[in-house]
Amino acid sequence: MNDNDNIDKDNIDTMNDNNKLIIGLDEAGRGPVLGPMVIALVKIKGQDLKNFEKLDIKDSKKHSKNRREELFEMIINNYDVRYEILEAKTIDKLMNTINLNKIELMAFTKLINSVLKEEYPNYKENSKIQTATPQIEIYIDACSSNEKAFANQIKSKLIVNDENNIKIIAEHKADENYKIVSAASIIAKVIRDRKIEEYKKIYGEIGSGYPSDKITQKYLANYVEKNRELPEIARKSWNTSKKLLKKIEDKNTVDKIKDSKRIKTNIELKQTKLVEF
């Protein structure tokens, strides 16, 4: 299922800590029709692992909003944090050529490689022959149904290739099983939530942005009815958006037909008056 089936999910191995880097990645906002998807990475040094494991960090969904904010500040102030914000228009553009899993994979590898570039400054661009010195463990919440294939895809795009020292552990629910991934999930969730709050100041109450959210549904329906288009923060490639656009297209077609009939009727009336005259 992963590169190291003997890894204890409750407590990552802390042996040889001084020569180890632990990296966790997760996303927030994969499914919403409104707003961005955020990919986050948290990196800790091996010598900090024991203290990190003692922290009350769980999957972001298991913390209250206030607690997530507290943990967010603690994590970014004590550990290496990186993130990628993919706005709706960026997601739509990428969806023209690749699917959502590949978009997520692309963002994961971009963040991981940003770490590797710093850890191995002498790497050669597009080279796969380097050997890493420290042991690097990368934990990822897998978005693909095939965890092993997902891990291999990530590995194939890394700028450092070392089977002995770089381990990729990609699993479903990794955000529940590994604190380092839980930390990344908190970072991603808080950043997305803050973006949604920014949008509300511009667009009014938009809800959570998820298609199942009644407030989001009402907001989108009203916006499209009024403006005959989707807001900039909407993912136009989502089925929810496509259905709303289809309704507008159908309504525009009906309106054009009505206008055409009205014009035709007016012409006929004018012709009738001329004949009578």
Curated annotation (Swiss-Prot):
It catalyses: Endonucleolytic cleavage to 5'-phosphomonoester. GO terms for cellular component: cytoplasm; ribonuclease H2 complex. The keyword Nucleus does not apply. Residues 20-250 form the RNase H type-2 domain. It is found in: Cytoplasm. Pfam families: RNase_HII. InterPro entries: RNase_H2_suA (IPR004649), RNase_HII/HIII (IPR001352), RNase_HII/HIII_dom (IPR024567), RNase_HII_arc (IPR020787), RNase_HII_hlx-loop-hlx_cap_dom (IPR023160), RNaseH-like_sf (IPR012337), RNaseH_sf (IPR036397). Manganese or magnesium. Binds 1 divalent metal ion per monomer in the absence of substrate. May bind a second metal ion after substrate binding. Its main location: cytoplasm. Keywords: Cytoplasm, Endonuclease, Hydrolase, Manganese, Metal-binding, Nuclease. Coiled coil: none annotated. Its cofactor is Mn(2+); Mg(2+). A divalent metal cation binds at D26, E27, D141. Belongs to the RNase HII family. Endonuclease that specifically degrades the RNA of RNA-DNA hybrids. PANTHER family: RIBONUCLEASE (PTHR10954:SF23), RIBONUCLEASE H2 SUBUNIT A (PTHR10954). This is Ribonuclease HII. The gene is rnhB.
